[in-house]
From Swiss-Prot:
Native source organism of the sequence: Dickeya chrysanthemi (Pectobacterium chrysanthemi)
This protein's encoding gene: oxyR
Lineage top rank: taxon: Bacteria
Pfam families: HTH_1, LysR_substrate
Protein name: Hydrogen peroxide-inducible genes activator
Biological role stated in the UniProt entry: Required for the induction of a regulon of hydrogen peroxide inducible genes such as catalase and glutathione-reductase.
Record-stated family: Belongs to the LysR transcriptional regulatory family.
Length: 305
């Protein structure tokens, strides 16, 4: 038995499909299947039920998967400890980002991070919050940048900046001549939302419910750009995070208005595993991003004033 065998086993448990598990491990399906059989022979127990086309684990298999996850997490800690013996801000770093942050934040921070930490090899991974937290817990990710939610409280959260949301309406909307919109004005309105799984959806829904607004259930978007295009087409209104909003008040048929009483906002944070030996690395990374984004958010706020 070796570490790679445990990685195959955990991948199979996560994907419940031999080909997809093999692809995630960058090996052929016969290789992965053969190693799982060898693992069963070595342990003397059946890990999988082979009476169905589905991947079903036996009770012994499920127990071993959980133990394998624990072992892989400890291996990750050992690698981090070894990494700490060199330069703190050098070597590979796997960073996860949510889709409503990544495309808009990365152009702001990546050039700065390359200049500040030229020896840091950054690998970027985009996924929804629940997927990022699972990958962070398993050790596949070193840290993640996301909007703080209840589920992220199990990790160390380092706040980076607060991101206000703006109301996006089509340019011929009756409110288009306003300078800003009170949240109470949304009472009775129906807003376009992202599909389930996006934390921004839950946050925007919370603000809408507090204001007496509701969701327009005729359509749910897979991305912020789809939401923006639906608004431009006159299909509805929505809340968008300010990093995704252009500097112009009106662009491509969409008018963007600040909201107040209260101002809807979310907190973007860097999160990492408790007890990680690379805590100093993550804190230094967070400090750099926070300092850079504080100036950027101040500029955005001044433009909206």
């Amino acid at each position: 038995m070796n570490i790679r065998d445990l990685e195959y086993l955990v991948a199979l448990a996560e994907h419940r499909h031999f080909r997809r598990a093999a692809d995630s491990c960058h090996v052929s399906q016969p290789t992965l299947s053969g190693q799982i059989r060898k693992l069963e022979d070595e342990l003397g127990v059946m890990l999988l039920e082979r009476t169905s086309r589905k991947v079903l684990f036996t009770q012994a298999g499920l127990l071993l998967v959980e133990q394998a996850r624990t072992v892989l997490r400890e291996v990750k800690v050992l690698k981090e400890m070894a990494s700490q013996q060199g330069e703190a801000m050098s070597g590979p770093l796997h960073i996860g980002l949510i889709p409503t942050v990544g495309p808009y934040l990365l152009p702001q921070i990546i050039p700065m991070l390359h200049r500040a930490f030229p020896k840091l090899e950054m690998y970027l991974h985009e996924a929804q919050t629940h997927q990022l937290l699972a990958q962070l817990d398993s050790g596949k990710l070193d840290c993640a940048i996301l909007a703080m939610v209840k589920e992220s409280e199990a990790f160390i959260e380092v706040p980076l900046f607060d991101e206000p949301m703006k109301l996006a309406i089509y340019q011929d909307h009756p409110w288009a001549n306003r300078e800003r919109v009170a949240m109470s004005d949304l009472s009775g309105e129906k807003l376009l939302m992202l599909e389930d799984g996006h934390c921004l959806r839950d946050q925007a829904m919370g603000f809408c419910f507090q204001a007496g607004a509701d969701e327009d259930t005729h359509f749910r978007a897979t991305s912020l750009e789809t939401l923006r295009n639906m608004v431009a087409a006159g299909s509805g209104i929505t809340l968008l995070p300010s990093l995704a909003v252009p500097q112009e008040r009106i662009r491509d048929g969409v008018c963007y208005l600040p909201c107040y009483k209260p101002e809807p906002k979310r907190t973007i944070a860097l999160v990492y595993r408790p007890g990680s030996p690379l805590r100093g690395r993550y804190e230094q990374l967070a400090d750099s991003v926070r300092e850079h984004m504080q100036l950027h958010m101040e500029k955005l706020s001044a433009q909206s004033a």
